[in-house]
Amino acid sequence: MKSTLKKRWGRIALCLCMANFACAGMAQTNKKLDDQVINTMKTATQFMMDKVSYNGGFVWNYLPDMSRSWGEMEAKRTMVWIQPPGTPSVGHLLLDAYHATGDEYYYEAAQKVANTLIWGQLECGGWNYVFDFAGENSLKSWYDTVGKNGWRLEEFQHYYGNATYDDAGTMEAAKFLLRMYVEKNDPAFRPALEKTIDFVLKSQYPVGGWPQRYPLMYDHPFQGKKDYSSFITLNDDVIPDATEFLIQCYQAMGLQGVKEPIMRAMYLMISLQQGEPYAGWADQYTVDDLKPAHARSYEPRSVNTGTTVRLINLMMDYYKLTADTRFLSGIPAAIRFLESMKLPESDVKKWKRQSTNPEAILVPRFVDPDTGKPLYVHRKGSNVKNGTYYICLLYTSPSPRDS
């Protein structure tokens, strides 16, 4: 019996010993892998900060020899892009790396990015899509040459000189500055952050929404239509992003003065929903009567099905924040609207729009808010000189921007 127990204990001891060796080996392997990852991160970050950035600023893409670079359009070397995945996005990534590693190098790199953004902050407190370390005349020259030839990118065909909420530009920079401030309560970032908060509060309409650009300007009518930059804007999450930023300021800084503007913006979302049977949301609204409005030449006055899906989810988020069932009340009608716009299976096959999700449906992107008819966007030509967008009721293009 003793012999049997000794054998069993011997086997157990051997197994435990082997397990310990295995764990030790795995720990060494994991540590080696961790070290490799950390070293690679550091090398890549040093290259980006020392070789790629311009005074701590970034665009989107670069040739390997750095001879050319691009944001949403080709950029000068001295330009800094704000739209994601531009300079604020890099700043967020550096702070994330700092949290993951505890290495102060990443925080110092994030500081450099933040100071670059502060340099490019407009007097009004927001940011344009891009700024230029070579000065405003250099930026105007870019708009007059590169920007004005941006077919589809009509927002670059005119230099306003003001700030934009479009494409999360100002809000991405604002959220990064907020993170930088609360990370160590560094007072150096407080003035720029307060300037940004003041910009967001001043630019909010009394009804609760925000324009695409601010200070308000009306000097770029396009193809016979009014300048749309002053319209109340949901497109690209202008209102949701501004609201989220104020919520973050309320949570992180305890600012009581932002609570009422937050609530005003949230409850506006209920008012902006259209009545049945086309009970969705538009991308833009006129300020005086909250009616759907146009934007760029390929963005007609319409109810947008994609925006409607986004707003359904947002309304559920606002319900979770407030417990107010009014945020849920319009969701059934919005779902009925989306289901009513379902295109036949023949269109799904014809245009090769099959989804891996068996519950997904194909719908037109734009819907006439008065008639409920789909509005399909097409284009012809190849550039700003000979090209144009046009809208019709037939889905005939093999590569439309409408679904």
Residue ranges and their predicted role:
Residues 1-29:
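Bacterial Sec-dependent N-terminal signal peptides
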Residues 29-41, 98-111, 181-194, 250-263, ...:
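Structural helix-adjacent loops and short alpha-helical linkers that scaffold large soluble proteins
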Residues 38-51:
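Mature N-terminal segment immediately following signal peptide/propeptide cleavage
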Residues 52-101, 106-244, 259, 273-294, ...:
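Extended ligand-binding groove/face enriched in aromatic
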Residues 264-326, 336-339, 343:
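A compositional/structural signature marking long, glycine- and acidic/polar-rich segments
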Residues 333-353:
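C-terminal, active-site-flanking charged/polar segments
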Residues 395-402:
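Conserved small/polar residues in nucleotide/adenosyl-binding loops
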